[in-house]
Curated annotation (Swiss-Prot):
InterPro entries: PPIase_dom_sf, PPIase_Pin1, PPIase_PpiC, PPIase_PpiC_CS. GO terms for cellular component: cytosol; endoplasmic reticulum; mitochondrion; plasmodesma. It catalyses: [protein]-peptidylproline (omega=180) = [protein]-peptidylproline (omega=0). Disulfide bonds: none annotated. Pfam families: Rotamase. This is Peptidyl-prolyl cis-trans isomerase Pin1. The gene is PIN1.
Amino acid sequence: MASRDQVKASHILIKHQGSRRKASWKDPEGKIILTTTREAAVEQLKSIREDIVSGKANFEEVATRVSDCSSAKRGGDLGSFGRGQMQKPFEEATYALKVGDISDIVDTDSGVHIIKRTA
């Protein structure tokens, strides 16, 4: 359970050639990531977000299938965190969301994300 100054969130991360780490659980050698442009990653996430918001897809199921973060095995669940624990753009986007809302595309050194605030 998140304390008053903490939030709880899940996310879907798509890494691209500009990401600080070029490997993920589903692409251990980074072969796909190295050939994915930021623009392609953003377009993929926009399409995913549309499907989730329209009800065609479930956030957690999509996160499990496509997220480049190891949190994919938990449906993208990052658990609770407070200010200063995540990269600034990620933190600001998460704190700006209401519980249940899904962010627009958020850029960090890790890649591009959509975030769902869960508490």
